Amino acid sequence: MTSILIYCPNPTPRHDYIFELFFRMLLGVDYSYTPNVNEAMVNYSHKKNESFHIVPYGLLDEFSIRTDILDEISFETSKMITAFFKTVGGSCQFDLFSAAFFLVSRYEEYLPFSLDNHRRFPAEASVLFKNNMLEEPLINQWAIFIRQELTTNFEISFPKMKFTYLSTIDIDQAWKYKYKGIIRNILGLVRDVIRVNISEIRERIQVFLGIISDPYFNFKWQNEFHLSLKTQVIYFILLGKYGSYDKNIKPSNPHFISLIKDLDSLSYARLGIHPSYVSNSNPIQLSKEYQNLNTIISGSITMSRQHYLIHAMPYTYRQLIKLGIKEDFTLGYSTHIGFRAGIASSFYWFDLTENIKTDLLLTPFCIMDITPMYYRSETPEIAKKTIESLLNKVQAVDGTFVSLWHNESLSETDRWKGWRSVYVHLNKLANDIIFSE
């Protein structure tokens, strides 16, 4: 394996973390430090030489969290790349390593900000949104720039990195009507009558008479479709108690248990826990849901995604690590498409308050079903164009395109009529890209 020699006089845990991200994870090569600046391929110091030189901004030398750092962020474009933390005298006019660290560490989410109505960090508060960069996989672009600079100046080769696609599906409600109990169904029917929702009343009655299938229970169609394209899927299962934001049926329901076991047996699918809305502030409830799922599958779940994408730095990730979770898929926005951490690849979580890299792998998603349908008010046909644009950007940097859907959004009912075709379109496009490379 190719190894990149880096001159960095006093490497810290932040240096180690970001060099591993760029060279091992994004570029597929190894790296090591050299005490001799003249033999370095990458010079990350204030000394000048003929190698690829990035002048440090200073963020990686620090050990604390600075509350004034947002005032220092200004995006500019130089040598066809857009970045921040501008420096003078190097091969690149920015400290890309510090900029990348700021983004993937989610530095800004440790700073004071106004929570949204679900106690989340809002997209509008992010530096990427404020600078119209949210829809760009910047760090992947910077990695390609570094690769080009190194291959120009040195006789080294990099392995070919490939575009990958992953479909993730949250099961918030496995059934729309069935197995929810008499009381919930009566209350639902009363609500529909009060709202004069004739279509819901008709659909509910038809489901219970066996005339039509429950629209949310579309897993047979999903299975046939995913098998036809050999799509890799992760299902995240909500097992929380019934509440204002947790609407699934009881985890003890035998039909629900049977569904979970069926999904776990699929060759192309993996399962993860979908911690309930209330569990984010209740570690006992979180542990109970996790153990319930482990018991059902007679195994050990290692993946998660927070319900409603609720997570707080660093509390939520620390709780997941204690639980035994190895990979989390929460990072993204429901209100906006794009790259919350400025990257279209998985990366390890760096705990800023402890100033250490952890073993928790974060896999961000770039589009969620509700975003084009509700927040962008797009038709299915326009949403397909939106997805194509994002796919092209991820393909261009050999990244990983992760989408977030629900069995509800594949139901072809109510507000989701026509949206199954969007999911089909996305998966076929991604499949074409994979098999064309």
Enumerate the language-model features and the residues they cover.
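Catalytic domains of cell-wall/extracellular-matrix polysaccharide-remodeling enzymes
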Residues: 37, 277-356, 414-416
